[in-house]
Amino acid sequence: MVDSDGFRPNVGIILANAAGQVFWARRIGQNAWQFPQGGIKAQETPEEALFRELEEEVGLAPADVEVMGCTRGWLRYRLPRRLIRSRSRPVCIGQKQVWFLLRLVGEEEQVQLDRSERPEFDHWRWVDFWHPVQEVVFFKRRVYTRALQELGPLLFPDGLPRQPPVGRPRRSAPPRGCRRA
């Protein structure tokens, strides 16, 4: 499902433990880490999509988590041109997401990344609150920052941890004899 502007409705999940660390997962067969996320199906509410994705990708049931809050509106990111499938219809140029902050109230042993027929992730770990902004693929950084800034006060009512500066993604050097434009 893609909206009239070319954005796919989606939910993003920030799962935190009692220490204020967040769940960080590696996509299968890649060195790409991200928060769990997934599309909202037709006739599905964002909260229904949240719990479906949480079970499919992380293996947790609603009883394993406490919903602490969600973003006030959609947060959008555009895909780089090389990732846009321009031959598919409708063309999806990015995602619009409602982000949810969850606290794990069950046992972390309940996490099972292989609960679905097609798992998304092969490894996970707890990381410091701002770590995902440093490590996520560049085109998602702004959305991750906004989601963490908006939802973080629910997890840290006395003040957010200090956010380290985010560096620009490294560019590889051009081949010998080539000049950058």
Curated annotation (Swiss-Prot):
Keywords: Hydrolase
Region of interest called Disordered, as start-end residue ranges on this chain: 159-181
GO process annotations (BP): mRNA catabolic process
Presence of the UniProt keyword Hydrolase in the record: yes
EC number: 3.6.1.-
A GO term, aspect molecular function: mRNA 5'-diphosphatase activity
Domain of life of the organism encoding this protein: Bacteria
Cofactor: a divalent metal cation
One cellular-component annotation, GO: cytoplasm
Bias type Basic residues, positions: 168-181
Record function comment: Accelerates the degradation of transcripts by removing pyrophosphate from the 5'-end of triphosphorylated RNA, leading to a more labile monophosphorylated state that can stimulate subsequent ribonuclease cleavage.
Entry-linked HAMAP family: Nudix_RppH (MF_00298)
Protein name per Swiss-Prot or TrEMBL: RNA pyrophosphohydrolase
Gene name of this polypeptide: rppH
